[in-house]
A protein has these predicted regions:
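Short amphipathic alpha-helical interaction/hinge segments
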Residues: 9, 53, 82-86
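Leucine-rich amphipathic alpha-helices with coiled-coil/heptad-repeat character
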Residues: 1, 5-12, 89
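Short, contiguous alpha-helical
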Residues: 69-91
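Acidic/histidine-rich alpha-helical segments that form the ligand environment
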Residues: 3-4, 17-73
Length: 91
């Protein structure tokens, strides 16, 4: 995403403290159960997919085919990973 933002002439967030400030996914601490870890990953992916879909709508309205295509590809990959993690959990 950062490269795409640069291509469009803007400056992406580029340090960890910026990411922490704008993130909607909070850090999980001291998770020792494997299944719980996978549940946390799944919940995080659902947040990411929702945000990517919002961006997909925005890029479509803006006529930005490059970013739209990139978001579509990212969503496809995340959905596949969600399916695999759900399969792992027996869902």
């Amino acid at each position: 995403i950062a490269e795409r933002i640069l291509t469009l002439g803007a400056t992406p967030a580029h340090n960890y403290s910026d990411y922490l400030t704008v993130s909607t996914i909070k850090e999980s601490k001291e998770v020792t159960d494997g299944n719980k870890s996978v549940e946390i990953i799944l919940n995080s992916y659902k947040v990411v997919i929702d945000l990517q879909r919002e961006l997909l709508d925005i890029t479509e309205e803006a006529g930005d085919e490059g970013t739209n295509s990139q978001m579509s590809d990212y969503i496809t990959e995340r959905e596949k990973e969600v399916w695999m993690y759900n399969s792992y959990l027996g869902k």
